[in-house]
């Protein structure tokens, strides 16, 4: 009987290089307060956010991903042709299919690399790192591009105040490849679907396709005024994000810290072994609470990119890491604990050596 041949695995992996893209338009808290009843003082006190970036209409999710990817490739000393796999985490790509990753592979000259998108919201980048680590160690891939990218300005209602004022646009990317030493620890990831509605869209896409009339669902295309050619305004209601802030805050502050501790334990490290802590940039108070529960010493540098970038969902951890390395280049090669958590609720964490 013939024996199935398997790929030769790689013992270890690490992040080879990182890239980022931040849109040029900056939205201040005073700008936000034109849309909601609030103040700069209240927003800073409750969230730690001063500004967030917004992409213009002519800059797409794909464009932002490409910018971040090209920098990550350059910093890795690689070209698109050397990529085996591309993993993109996003909840704001406007096409259900085909994937952003496949389009990006073509732009980067990475064809025929495997390419796919994942939807794990603010934990998506850590999910991508977990998958890339496994793909490289199994021998199924050699170099994997992982991207977190969001144009959340496309999926928010500026006039609601549960989540929209928190969110920003941007992209972060890393290349993961083989390493002679362990550079990515075991991933701790999972979900709690009992809190599925804690962060959600207002309604499904099918509600755009049809609207209710006389107790029945009617196709939106049939609700066009024959004289004016205009569509019924109810037929074009675009889904936007909403959040139960208290539920998310409580879960992230305590359960999130537990997950982060599990990742630290799985890597065989203690808090004092860390050089940096890069949590999802959801809220400055959550970041501070998690650091307190984890009992991180003052020597651990904590990423606080949220102050300037807001919450960028899947992009937040790579963006925060990118800024951290720019401000503290001495952290390169040192261990960092990263954790993402968000809509689902889903979570993912691991310890990595910074590129």
Swiss-Prot record:
It is found in: Cytoplasm. The keyword Lipid biosynthesis applies. Its main location: cytoplasm. Keywords: Acyltransferase, Cytoplasm, Fatty acid biosynthesis, Fatty acid metabolism, Lipid biosynthesis, Lipid metabolism, Multifunctional enzyme, Transferase. Residues 281-285 are annotated as: ACP-binding. GO terms for biological process: fatty acid biosynthetic process; secondary metabolite biosynthetic process. One of its GO terms (cellular component) is cytoplasm. Signal peptide: none annotated. GO terms for molecular function: 3-oxoacyl-[acyl-carrier-protein] synthase activity; beta-ketoacyl-acyl-carrier-protein synthase III activity. InterPro entries: ACP_syn_III_C, ACP_syn_III_N, FabH, Thiolase-like. Pfam families: ACP_syn_III, ACP_syn_III_C. The active site is at residues 122, 280, 311. It catalyses: malonyl-[ACP] + acetyl-CoA + H(+) = 3-oxobutanoyl-[ACP] + CO2 + CoA. Its EC number is 2.3.1.180. The keyword Cell inner membrane does not apply. Pathway: Lipid metabolism; fatty acid biosynthesis. CDD domains: KAS_III. The last Arg residue of the ACP-binding site is essential for the weak association between ACP/AcpP and FabH. Homodimer. PANTHER family: 3-OXOACYL-[ACYL-CARRIER-PROTEIN] SYNTHASE 3 (PTHR34069), BETA-KETOACYL-[ACYL-CARRIER-PROTEIN] SYNTHASE III (PTHR34069:SF2). This is Beta-ketoacyl-[acyl-carrier-protein] synthase III. It comes from Kocuria rhizophila (strain ATCC 9341 / DSM 348 / NBRC 103217 / DC2201). The lineage of its organism: Bacteria, Bacillati, Actinomycetota, Actinomycetes, Micrococcales.
């Amino acid at each position: 009987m013939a024996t199935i041949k398997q790929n030769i695995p790689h013992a270890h992996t690490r992040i080879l290089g990182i890239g980022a893209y931040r849109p040029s338009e900056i939205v201040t808290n005073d700008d936000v307060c034109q849309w909601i009843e609030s103040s700069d003082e209240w927003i800073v006190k409750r969230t730690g956010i001063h500004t967030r970036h917004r992409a213009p209409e002519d800059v797409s999710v794909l464009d932002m991903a490409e910018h971040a990817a090209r920098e990550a490739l350059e910093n890795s000393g690689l070209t698109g042709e050397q990529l085996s796999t591309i993993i993109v985490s996003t909840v704001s790509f406007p096409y259900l299919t085909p994937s952003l990753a496949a389009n990006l592979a073509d732009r980067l000259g990475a064809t025929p690399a495997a390419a796919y998108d994942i939807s794990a919201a603010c934990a998506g980048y850590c999910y991508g790192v977990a998958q890339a680590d496994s793909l490289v160690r199994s021998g199924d891939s050699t170099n994997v591009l992982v991207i977190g990218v969001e144009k959340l300005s496309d999926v928010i209602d500026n006039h609601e105040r549960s989540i929209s004022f928190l969110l920003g646009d941007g992209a972060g990317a890393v290349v993961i490849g083989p390493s002679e030493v362990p550079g990515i620890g075991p991933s701790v990831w999972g979900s709690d679907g009992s809190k599925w509605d804690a962060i959600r869209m207002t309604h499904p896409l099918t509600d755009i396709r049809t609207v209710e009339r006389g107790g029945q669902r009617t196709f939106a295309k049939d609700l066009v005024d024959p004289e004016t050619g205009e569509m019924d305004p109810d037929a074009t209601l675009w889904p936007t994000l909403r959040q139960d802030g208290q539920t998310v805050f409580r879960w992230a502050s305590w359960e999130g810290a537990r997950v982060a501790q599990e990742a630290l334990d799985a890597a065989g490290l203690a808090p004092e072994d860390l050089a940096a802590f890069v949590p999802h940039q959801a809220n400055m108070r959550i970041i501070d609470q998690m650091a307190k529960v984890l009992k991180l010493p003052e020597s651990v540098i904590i990423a606080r990119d949220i102050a300037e970038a807001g919450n960028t969902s899947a992009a937040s951890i790579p963006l925060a890491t990118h800024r951290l390395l720019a401000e503290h280049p001495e952290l390169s090669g040192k261990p960092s604990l990263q954790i993402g958590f968000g809509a689902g609720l889903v979570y993912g964490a691991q310890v990595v050596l910074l590129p």
